[in-house]
């Protein structure tokens, strides 16, 4: 039989089974950069509209990790998908360059070098150099992922023009009356010595003291209640704030119970508190909280008065129903203080230590001066004496600084805020608050997943005013002048635009370098002595939140349209970039700066735990790329439900590699089997068999399914449809049935040529759907197939576009085989019986069989093809019988060329093979 091997169509392709991705991909990516692939993508337009994905900036510090890869790969898939649909695409990657982490890096370096740098300009220069260094590192690492974008001209928040744009956005906020200076409690990082915005706070578990303290009512209050003794019992987990207590808040219209021992608590909580031993069991009096308002108690720590007030924030689920109130250390306390005109006491310095205010205001004795508040808590608790009713330790969720990961405190300071509830004029002349405008805007935005809408909505509903000012150096300054004659900020347009122009030309370092006079426009310079600079910098979330203006609006559409079609970030950005962008967009334009928000989860280990170096469960991105290649990493991203957290381990990547090999080997098989086709046959109509029609109709059906899934950004659903098709209909049915014709028929055989056209159409669809994900691999596929390039009219991957199979193959309709489901059912039953006969050693393969089918309406040729038997009909030697069919030994001899049992003489080719051999 060996002599016939060379007569078979055992075609090959130069497309390798092994991708050797880690070696070949960098060459491809270098070629794309050299050819300016992204510019070419932007130049192509098929009149299917524009698409802008606005990039949320990563921080220009450190190397990339797998979380960065997840985010950028998803963006790249979304952008390329829109590109291959024929849209003009815009995607400008960017970097967040200002902020505390870089400052800390520079300070640590200076400390190691044992040098100090008081000059703010030189310090900022070092910060800028650090950001530049890591920006370039990260840029090259992104390119290794096969990500394409305008990396030649990315946006950087530290560029002079960008800093000016950020400042101009701030000016708009000020002009609309939403920027105000306030003395109020805010999150304060004593580790960073700076204010924090809500987005810069993360919640982690922390152990804290939990204490119940009795505040005795003063004599006049006892007389009003007509009782001899009564103490309101408060519960707190921040004993260090007791020094600043000025009030006790009760729930409005609630019943409060006085016990025999004189403890006053909410009646709804009395039983629980008695069980803890905080109060005694017997109730002697009951009071409505409204009757307790304006009574006065005594703070046992410093004997200062504490007013009884009523607060909407007081709950009856935990605690005592009596809330310790210190307006200098809590936002709800602060707002209650405004209603009751309470004193704001705050005697804690930037480092979190008690300052001299504790002595001046007689809040604590001088031994506490300079002591950190958390360290002082033990002594404070001891000082309470008999007023301490119970002390425990609890573990609870507590705010921490997201940069230092240390606990934060609430501390009243003078800061600049964007006001959420101050009405301002809209485009239509009406007045709404920023909170109202933002909530209205959310309703017009699409969210993927849809749960993101309520998440963002709830955050906007409940968020406080936005604290903008930071007491640092590396950032855009809050560059306003205070007029010392009025003690008010100067918001004159001439002054503000002059500063903005200086920033655009020379960078905002000038705010530190120049004198007040040099920063003012000429017409104001005579009065320079009356002005002083505000020396705060802006919250970096304002930088990133105004990127839509700096990138999309300031370039007048050159870098994309505003509002952008899509923004795509991790789910943590609901409290970060999504909010800051939304709020600034609503101030500037009365609308969200984006139409759709897509969110993804986080990278966790195989157990679902967060990755950390201390746990030793970090998976190195660099190692993954070297082991598997970027296309496998990209496929892993797309083959996962990215809307939830993504589990990572070597096992998961090994599984993904198997998926990749399945796609690659399928494409290799397809390429090999139409590699010998006559290119003249590409455009002419073909006579397709019923089985071909089944395959082509299936191809169009699954194409619709994949397109639908990809439109919804459900890549895992689309890929599962594609993988099921490749495994079942393509490999499991069609290719098995066609191998005989592909290998053994004449090259000019019409049936074989029609099959090759089906394979070509299938390969083209696989290329189209996989190109946004496996861009390098599909580029490689096209390099190795001239037929595919001609069929798709694509010289490389960037020329790809969707095709209609029916139009391309001149088909007006698909003629699916009659009774096809019945033939497939027969095939399934046949394969079961075949396996049994193989195990018993009766036969070796299906070609040894003849089959008699009980259902006479079935097409015999189709049965022979799909079951891969040599004969359909009755033969002499019965092998087995089932209700649906009878199996016989094939009645003819084995053909030495095609191995089917169709030869009339032993060791002689069958009639088909004999004819093929004559034509050679």
UniProtKB/Swiss-Prot annotation:
Q: Which cofactor does it need?
A: Zn(2+)
Please tell me one Gene Ontology term that the record gives under cellular component.
cytosol
Q: Which SUPFAM superfamilies match?
A: Anticodon-binding domain of a subclass of class I aminoacyl-tRNA synthetases (SSF47323), Nucleotidylyl transferase (SSF52374), ValRS/IleRS/LeuRS editing domain (SSF50677)
Q: Where is this motif: 'HIGH' region?
A: 58-68
Stored Pfam families: Anticodon_1 (PF08264), tRNA-synt_1 (PF00133)
Subcellular localization(s) per the UniProt record:
Cytoplasm
Quick one: which residues bind Zn(2+)?
895, 898, 910, 913
The reactions it catalyses are:
tRNA(Ile) + L-isoleucine + ATP = L-isoleucyl-tRNA(Ile) + AMP + diphosphate
Which Enzyme Commission number(s) are on file for it?
6.1.1.5
**Xref: HAMAP family:** Ile_tRNA_synth_type1
Q: Which family does it belong to?
A: Belongs to the class-I aminoacyl-tRNA synthetase family. IleS type 1 subfamily.
Q: What is this protein called?
A: Isoleucine--tRNA ligase
Its lineage reads: Bacteria, Pseudomonadati, Campylobacterota, Epsilonproteobacteria, Campylobacterales
- What is the gene called? ileS
């Amino acid at each position: 039989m060996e002599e016939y091997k060379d007569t078979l169509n055992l075609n090959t392709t130069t497309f390798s089974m092994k991708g050797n991705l880690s070696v070949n991909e960098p060459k491809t990516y270098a070629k794309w950069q050299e050819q300016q692939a992204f510019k070419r993508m932007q130049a192509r337009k098929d009149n299917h509209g524009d698409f802008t994905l606005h990039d949320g900036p990563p921080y220009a510090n450190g190397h990339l990790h797998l979380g960065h890869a997840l985010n950028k790969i998803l963006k790249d898939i979304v952008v390329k998908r829109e590109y291959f649909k024929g849209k003009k695409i815009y995607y400008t990657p960017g970097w967040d360059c200002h902020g505390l982490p870089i400052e800390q890096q520079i300070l640590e370096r200076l400390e190691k070098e044992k040098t100090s740098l008081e000059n703010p300009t030189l310090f900022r220069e070092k910060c800028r150099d650090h950001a530049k260094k890591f920006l370039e590192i990260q840029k090259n690492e992104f390119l290794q992922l096969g990500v394409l974008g305008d990396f030649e001209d990315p946006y950087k928040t530290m560029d002079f023009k960008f800093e000016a744009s950020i400042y101009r956005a701030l000016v708009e906020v000020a002009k609309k009356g939403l920027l105000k200076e306030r003395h109020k409690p805010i999150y304060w990082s004593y580790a960073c010595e700076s204010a924090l915005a809500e987005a810069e706070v993360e919640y982690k578990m922390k152990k804290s003291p939990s204490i119940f303290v009795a505040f005795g009512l003063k004599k006049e209050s006892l007389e009003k209640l007509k009782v001899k003794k009564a103490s309101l019992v408060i519960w707190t987990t921040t004993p260090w704030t007791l020094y600043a207590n000025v009030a006790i808040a009760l729930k409005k219209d609630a019943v409060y119970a006085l016990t025999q021992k004189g403890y006053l608590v909410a009646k709804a909580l009395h039983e629980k508190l008695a069980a803890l031993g905080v109060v005694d069991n017997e109730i002697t009096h009951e009071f409505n909280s409204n009757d307790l308002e304006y009574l006065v108690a005594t703070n046992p720590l410093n004997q200062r008065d504490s007013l009884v007030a009523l607060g909407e924030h007081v709950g009856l689920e935990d605690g005592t129903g009596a809330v310790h109130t210190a307006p200098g250390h809590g936002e709800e306390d602060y707002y209650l203080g405004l209603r009751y005109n309470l004193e704001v006491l705050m005697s804690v310095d930037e480092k979190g230590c008690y300052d001299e205010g504790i002595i001046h205001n007689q809040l604590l004795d001088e031994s506490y001066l300079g002591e950190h508040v958390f360290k002082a808590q033990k002594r404070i608790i001891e000082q309470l004496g008999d007023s301490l009713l119970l002390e425990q330790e609890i573990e609870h969720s507590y705010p921490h600084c997201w940069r230092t990961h240390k606990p934060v405190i609430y501390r009243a300071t003078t800061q600049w805020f964007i006001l959420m509830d101050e009405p301002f004029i809209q485009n239509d002349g009406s007045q709404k608050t920023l909170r109202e405008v933002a909530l209205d805007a959310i309703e017009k935005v699409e969210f993927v997943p849809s749960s993101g809408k309520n998440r963002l909505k709830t955050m906007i509903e409940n968020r406080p005013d936005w604290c903008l000012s930071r007491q640092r150096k590396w950032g855009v300054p809050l560059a306003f002048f205070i007029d010392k004659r009025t003690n008010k900020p100067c918001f004159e347009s001439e002054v503000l635009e002059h500063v903005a122009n200086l920033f655009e030309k020379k960078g905002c370092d000038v705010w530190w370098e120049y004198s007040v006079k040099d920063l003012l426009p000429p017409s104001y310079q005579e009065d320079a002595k009356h002005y002083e600079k505000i020396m705060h910098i802006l919250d970096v979330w304002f930088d990133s939140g105004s990127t839509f203006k700096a990138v999309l609006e300031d370039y007048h559409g050159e870098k994309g349209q505003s509002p952008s079609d899509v923004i795509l970030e991790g789910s943590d950005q609901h409290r970060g970039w999504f909010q800051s962008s939304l709020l600034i967009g609503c101030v500037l334009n009365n609308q969200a700066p984006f139409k759709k928000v897509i969110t993804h989860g986080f990278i966790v280990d195989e157990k679902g735990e967060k990755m950390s170096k201390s746990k030793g469960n970090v998976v190195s991105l660099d190692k993954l790329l070297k082991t598997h290649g970027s296309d496998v990493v990209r496929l892993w991203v797309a083959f996962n439900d990215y809307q939830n957290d993504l589990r990572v381990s070597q096992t998961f990547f090994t599984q993904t590699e198997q998926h990749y090999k399945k796609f690659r080997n399928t494409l290799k098989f397809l390429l090999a089997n139409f590699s010998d086709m006559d290119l003249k046959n590409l455009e002419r109509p073909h006579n397709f068999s019923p089985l071909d029609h089944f395959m082509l109709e299936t191809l169009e059906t699954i194409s619709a399914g994949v397109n639908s899934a990809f439109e919804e950004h459900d890549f895992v659903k689309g890929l599962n449809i594609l993988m099921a098709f490749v495994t079942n209909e393509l490999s499991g049915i069609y290719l098995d049935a066609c191998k005989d014709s592909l290998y053994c028929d004449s090259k000019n055989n019409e049936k074989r040529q029609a099959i090759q056209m089906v394979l070509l159409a299938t390969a083209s669809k696989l290329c189209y759907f996989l190109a946004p994900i496996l861009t390098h691999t599909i580029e490689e596929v096209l390099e190795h197939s001239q037929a595919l390039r001609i069929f798709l009219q694509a010289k490389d991957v960037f020329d790809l576009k969707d095709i209609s199979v029916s139009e391309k193959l001149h088909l007006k309709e698909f003629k699916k085989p009659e009774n096809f489901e019945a033939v497939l059912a027969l095939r399934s039953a046949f394969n079961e019986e075949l396996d049994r006969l193989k195990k018993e050693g009766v036969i070796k393969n299906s070609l040894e069989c003849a089959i008699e089918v009980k259902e006479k309406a079935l097409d015999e040729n189709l049965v022979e093809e799909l079951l891969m038997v040599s004969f359909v009909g009755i033969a002499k030697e019965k092998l087995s019988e089932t209700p649906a069919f009878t199996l016989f030994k094939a009645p003819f001899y084995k053909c030495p060329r095609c191995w089917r049992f169709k030869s009339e003489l032993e060791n002689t080719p069958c009639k088909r093979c004999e004819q093929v051999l004559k034509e050679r």
